[in-house]
């Protein structure tokens, strides 16, 4: 039996680890701190072991036919994937595909090995929802590339109860702060829309959720353009809006105004040091309290117009909450990762470097819904 090497047992990993062990897979859980790996597997029985992680120890253990899941910091992924290719092992990660990862595609195909990335929440479930909506639209009577097309996808990790700061951290805030310094590129009114500072592009965004109507704030992040082709928005389509972005509670931009001002001034090593200091301060003041539950909202919208009239308008919505056992974020990041692991082991995903697979999207979303996630498709024209 192929052995699964799960690298990293941080906060977002535990449900996926436990699911694979409970389903009878052979698993080695690697973590720099062995105690964390032991906590992640506490109370389980099966063919699993925990080990102290180092690249050297992992390399010595990895065998041809095995599979490695990298839930390590992003700068490890390519090294782990390259080691897998040289050993004859497959690879799964929830992170975005870096250019260096994409460059491994030819080598992976040559060796008949599969490297799957972007199979967490965002990126991951958002891709799957987009694929399902696009399949539905293409199969409809109203489909035509000449229609005006509009697409938006927003995801946010929130606290169950809104606080004055309009945000609570379930792990170190440094990543959130660094993201505020990242420019974005999207499509608006059929034109390229570049934003250097996220807070300059904040918009209200109202959703009709199971618990009622709620207005959030959203803004674009990263470069949305590579995902147009991935989702099927080809050059012959009349696409007016295409944006992937971040969702926050209403009032977030006001509550964070002072942080925006400071982040904008930070430069060089001193700026990086101040960012770490600011992160630690925010963690002290706004961490998710013990016993407090988190929340994840994900909304993917696709609509089309002909002669100025809407002819298709559907959304794939999810409003999920953590419980006493796991955070919603951990469930929704690591459970799809475990789906991808099983699909690779069954040979269901071809060789090469891939994001969340199109073919499995509907099935995996149905399985997540069956696990109790509040999610589904809304037809706004019905």
Annotate each predicted stretch with a short phrase.
Residues 66-71, 92-93:
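N-terminal Rossmann-like NAD(P) cofactor-binding module of classical short-chain dehydrogenase/reductase
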Residues 27-40:
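NAD(P)-binding Rossmann-fold cofactor-contacting core
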Residues 83-101:
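ADP-ribose/adenylate-binding Rossmann-like module
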Residues 136-382:
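C-terminal catalytic/substrate-binding lobe primarily of soluble NAD(P)-dependent oxidoreductases
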Residues 95-115:
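Rossmann-fold NAD(P)-binding glycine/threonine-rich loop
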Residues 4-9:
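Conserved N-terminal Rossmann-fold NAD(P)-binding element of oxidoreductases
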